Amino acid sequence: MTDKPTLSICVPSRNRQIYFQKTIEGLLRNKRTDVEFIFTDNSDDPAIMNDFMADIVKDPRIVYLPTTDKVLSMMDNWERAAHASQGEWVVFIGDDDFVEPDVAGLILRITEVSPDIEALAWGALSYFWPVDGEMAGSVTVPFDHSVIRVPKADLMRRMFGWHEPTSVPTSGFSIYHSAVRRCLLERIYTKYNHRYFEHAVVDYDMAMKVIVEGKGFAFSQRPFSMFGACPQSNSFSIGRLEDTKERARIFMEEFGTNFEENEALRNFPFSSFLGCTATIGVVQQWFRKTYKVDLAGWEKGYAKACALNTESYRDKDAFDVISAGYETAFRNWQGGRFLKHYQPVWRGNMPMIEMSGATSSGMMVRSDIAGATTPAELWNVVSAMMIAPQDILVRPTGLRFLDEEASASGELTRLPGGNPAGTSGKAISGKPSPMRNAPNSRAGGR
């Protein structure tokens, strides 16, 4: 391994050893030497991962942090992973996810021509681990592979103003499935109470800090990672009422305190038990009040996002319970002014359809193609359908904004959440931006 890794890939885990092990095996198939792997276990039984790692840890690229003598909150488990990292750039993924280590090569080429870039996001695919009795899903491999510069003002508007939201802000740029430069991380650590992660909802905590403190942002339409959803993950529970409630209960229990009792939330009557949008609203309200960061007029967009969150519940009884909870919160918030913007529609139990083939945006591929049973195995197939990382065009004169990059498709360019990555501020004629609802928050116990 090189003395100073280009990229540290951090993978924290808790009590999901079988998925953690498969993810580790998939990552280590890449022999790149300028990448460092930080694997942190936080499980009740330390022996499982300790035995698994006994020989693997001999790889000089690996830093393994075993379970300590007490269970850590997810926030503290992520914190120790960040402290253990040495790379010039850092990315976190979940223990049921995947990221392509060769993104390190793209990072090097980007910073050579645009040295002000401090955060890189990319398109990400979503994968549901196989479950008996459930149909295999599909992923869409995009045709576009542009790399563009993203204006900070657009990210601020999307994160804090809830501009054009899905059920989540369409800003991206967390350290989760995005790479953050060391200098930016250290500024965040110094300013925010000498911690990288201050809030239990670690991904959105960091995303807000990266957007507020970052100087230059870049986005690659070519995907470099895959969100995984195993039956024990929070993203798997989206749209399932009992799973959502149980995940929230475990999350609060392992955190050790109810973060919703924070003084900053006194007049914000939304609970994380309602779902991912309410959870994001809670952490964002804490950040707004604590650090005096705000954009006027965000409430209407937030109400629309809450409606989309509610619509993810396909069971009518679950939909009614969540809808009633949100309605009560909106009725008791700011005199009920924004209740009229919360208008969810029950979509019914829509049947799943197995789909594959070409669309205008890319190639749809079944997630079990070639017998794939893990994100890493599926990545082996779909990455062969995409341009190789070393062949992605990075202009020698520096990155340009979307409306300045003729090769970029505004229809395809996405940030996590499903909307365009942004422009220099000019309108883009004839480039529609269809929405997709793909929340992937790690608000849960790792």
Which residue ranges define each predicted feature?
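C-terminal subregions of glycosyltransferases and related glycan-biosynthesis enzymes
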Residues: 123, 223-446
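Nucleotide-sugar donor-binding/catalytic module of glycosyltransferases
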Residues: 1-245
